[in-house]
Amino acid sequence: MTLCYPAKYSLPLQHTQQEDFWAGDFGREYTDRNSRPLDEWNAFYQGIYGHTKLEMNAEFIGDLPREARVLEVGCNTGMQLVGLQAMGFSNLYGIELQGYAVEKAREFVRGVNILQGSGFDLPFKDNYFDLVCTNGVLIHIAPEDLPRIMGEMVRCSGRYIMGYEYYAPDTTAINYRGNEGFLWKTDFARVFLENHPGLRLVKQHLYPYINDAEQGNQDVMFLLEKVPA
């Protein structure tokens, strides 16, 4: 079946260093290493934070109508989308840079619109979605490129932006499996708000790690809303 997307026209953009990195063998290895069925996915979060991902999602979007149109940017194999389906959401889209992950997602997720593409150039009309979200994606975007991908997320959202990312009060680079320049943590909600004054922070929750090996680290979920003009 061929899916038709409500596209906007744009000129092709040059890939960033991070996009090329994740589109290659390293990204494929990440996909194989981190793909889990729903029960294992929830157990993974339970072991890190003492909360399942479904519980975390419900805290932020539990009241969102289940027919809401939702886009996940950087969906990988679609584990988050499966979680949203389990919550009753039915109008779901995912976009993923890495072709291998897209193939896996189309096998793993049923009834979801999955396409290959870049978060820097989302092929959707302005305000098309009720919610645009990321899950551990902004951490892999170079700090100087964050305004560009965030701008696309804001453009495509008619109301809400949600993120789940690593957190630090200031931008901090992290060595990632021996590689430099591919992982950062910061206050991503603050970066959104600094670049888009038309947003307001609805909710933010810091989740400290409960396992001994990661004590002192914490991740964040946040929900932003477009302020009516």
Predicted regions, residues:
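Class I (Rossmann-like) S-adenosyl-L-methionine-dependent methyltransferase catalytic domain
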Residues: T2-P123, I141-R148, M162-A229
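A conserved beta-strand element that flanks and buttresses the S-adenosyl-L-methionine
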Residues: C133
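Short catalytic micro-motifs in class I SAM-dependent methyltransferases
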Residues: G136-H140
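A short glycine-rich, Lys/Arg-flanked "PGG" loop and its adjoining helix->strand segment in the class I
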Residues: P147-R159
